[in-house]
């Protein structure tokens, strides 16, 4: 999708469609939908339809007017943004996605989006607004129906953002939005592929190709390296599969980076999770192709980081393998020695994510990472706790949490902190080894995080359980159902926050 800025008055922009935001300023029984444009010609064009009460400004209400009077655009799209009081850049991002999804389904290929500029209501900084619109438009332009023979792949080819302000700053914001939006779609593309088309080896290849394009260092190692590093927990999972595992390392080492800070991003890359010997029921097992979403998120985040060039050192480690039952597979009761030296009693081979991450976290620390973030589709229990809305967030350090929460707020993604009290340690006690890999069902997401905490040790660490949020169960106005690319935006903001 081509993107460009226009500094004309919205009413003077020649386009197939001009999209504008309508907000609900109503109080008590007094309805008041206001077109967020300082251009009176645009407001006049929408006056009649607003007067009928048909347009209220409620969230994701879309009204398409043809041949609107007094403006140059062929159509005017009124996008309801909800209550004016709560409107923010996060809503604007979704509205841009909704505009794209509405218009591309009508075979429109190019349109213009007017930055809400009345300001009275939104108070969104112009640069943040442009970035949000571009990100949202890219997210909305992605469809996952790759393998349909009659795939239409309708897309928006060109987006013009009508804005006011400092051209250089707005161009930068647009570039940032493009990089982050495209990187999120890159992640979604990886996650979307089925396991026969995204084996650990293929994930490694995709990471390598991307790294070469954006100038990152990349290494992809196989089973020999796992054994050399004594990654007994990772190998325990990988040993049951005929597909070789891949230990993927991406390095971003800018000049003039912040001293003494080395961020480590660790991603779960299970390209298919059958459960292993503790096999999953057939019902819904096909979804376990997205069990590499955490890894794909880290690969996509590294792409964005390489292009945005924040001055902070970042290393990503992705643990990619299948989790399969076979004559070589690990069995319940087996004991594995993790890279850190800790012994793990395998209670349930389906609790494999924490095993691969244990060695990933340990390796990141060995490589000198000073701060760690992991992302993983780790537990069904996090879906029970938080549904399909919030990412489960855990932290072993409040300062690290505060930093991450700030970045998360800027990114506008739903995340919710869950506890890690020492009292939960009971749940991962083993009678024959240091810890078990699967505790009781209650508090399942926390038990998994407690397990990981043992391997983050004293390094400040954030764990993101994205099992409920990495895959959208339904179409939304702004995003297609399927892989969401969740957490990437927060991660990129977090990394940028450390730059000197
Ligand atoms: N990959 C799953 C978790 C998952 C569930 C991801 C639903 C996405 C949607 C993970 O490896 C798993 O199987 N976890 C088990 C752990 C249990 C055996 C302790 C679970 O949540 O049931
Ligand atoms: Mn599993
Ligand atoms: Zn899994």
Task: Report each predicted region and the residues it spans.
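Short amphipathic alpha-helical segment within the helicase RecA-like ATPase core
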Residues: 1-269
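A generic structural signal for tightly packed, nonpolar segments enriched in small/aliphatic residues
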Residues: 55, 204-500
